[in-house]
Amino acid sequence: MLPSQSPAIFTVSRLNQTVRLLLEHEMGQVWISGEISNFTQPASGHWYFTLKDDTAQVRCAMFRNSNRRVTFRPQHGQQVLVRANITLYEPRGDYQIIVESMQPAGEGLLQQKYEQLKAKLQAEGLFDQQYKKPLPSPAHCVGVITSKTGAALHDILHVLKRRDPSLPVIIYPTAVQGDDAPGQIVRAIELANQRNECDVLIVGRGGGSLEDLWSFNDERVARAIFASRIPVVSAVGHETDVTIADFVADLRAPTPSAAAEVVSRNQQELLRQVQSARQRLEMAMDYYLANRTRRFTQIHHRLQQQHPQLRLARQQTMLERLKKRMSFALENQLKRAGQQQQRLTQRLNQQNPQPKIHRAQTRIQQLEYRLAEILRAQLSATRERFGNAVTHLEAVSPLSTLARGYSVTTATDGNVLKKVKQVKAGEMLTTRLEDGWIESEVKNIQPVKKSRKKVH
């Protein structure tokens, strides 16, 4: 008999589903290190393998859209570090992990530490823009914290000498690689702040692997850079190398040479700017003097223009000019009047009716002659057509047929006789000849037999 408050009863499906949800929601994404075994890649492109250590193992799957980002081919027995989600395959109740990313174990562990420290310092606000100190402009002294034998120091000094040879440089030599390097870098930063000899610091080194650059991913170095009162420019490795020091520094330069470019002034450019400013000043002075000279000349000219004798001379000149203009205007007026009179005379001559009458009479005579010619031609053509019509009518007239010896005989009812069967003996007939008619009586009717010819 079951107790009154019985525990929940799960089906197998519900149990597997509940466990899967607990694993996915409670565990979330985790980092796992282990050795690869039983690696397979079917036609789908997915990877299936087992991740194990000395005492345990777990099944893993890495789908194609994730494994295409892996830069190496996993091998049996290889130690790797994976980032994965824990889940459960419900149909079989198999516990497994779904891998999102994979790295070789050594580099992967460093990368994991890098990400953890980055997240920690970012959460504390060490990367916030509000804490970034502005660089001095211009810098009066530059401090360099790097290896005294490295290529980075050579590059920095070469650029500073080329751009600003007079800029003082203080070198704080330190190791940049190895177990002692982080502590030495921290002490060099603190020493530079204690002496307060320079107003900007370059902290960096040349390129290398992740392990080579690891000193600049050390938490002690990051906090020392953040605590520095002197602005810090990080210059670690190449442009693609990004360290924790780059995030904490007041400014990140992609290379040591670029850092030297940032903190220094280009003396050649400054010289060009001074020369340009001098040229602008000289041009401004020349313009000012020319403007003052022109103004003085204008005032002097105006004073000269106000002299009484000059005014009288100008008025006399104006009077002479007006007299010439009046004379010229009068001559032009008379000339225009004469030209107008000539044009009117020409127009009047053009309007004389006699030439028009003569032309009209000539035109009428021409038209009368043409009309007479047309009438004569039309009359001749009409006569010719009439003669042709008469000739044609005469040719088809029955009278013409009678004139050739033929006659037309009609019965008493006026019908023209064509066959002998139309008449009977004793009937009266009328025959039309060329010059009159004949009436006759039928005495005898004699039909004509037609001969029939056989065609062979």
From Swiss-Prot:
Quaternary state and interactors: Heterooligomer composed of large and small subunits.
Similarity section: Belongs to the XseA family.
EC class (word): hydrolase
Gene Ontology biological process terms, A to Z: DNA catabolic process
Transmembrane residue ranges: none
One Pfam family it belongs to: tRNA_anti_2
An example molecular function term from Gene Ontology annotations: nucleic acid binding
EC number(s) per entry: 3.1.11.6
Protein name (record): Exodeoxyribonuclease 7 large subunit
Function, in words: Bidirectionally degrades single-stranded DNA into large acid-insoluble oligonucleotides, which are then degraded further into small acid-soluble oligonucleotides.
Catalytic activity of the protein: Exonucleolytic cleavage in either 5'- to 3'- or 3'- to 5'-direction to yield nucleoside 5'-phosphates
Subcellular location as annotated: Cytoplasm
Entry keyword set: Cytoplasm, Exonuclease, Hydrolase, Nuclease
NCBIfam families from the UniProt entry: xseA
Domain of life: Bacteria
Keyword tRNA processing attributed: no
InterPro entries in the record: Exonuc_VII_L (IPR003753), Exonuc_VII_lsu_C (IPR020579), OB-fold_nuc-bd_dom (IPR025824)
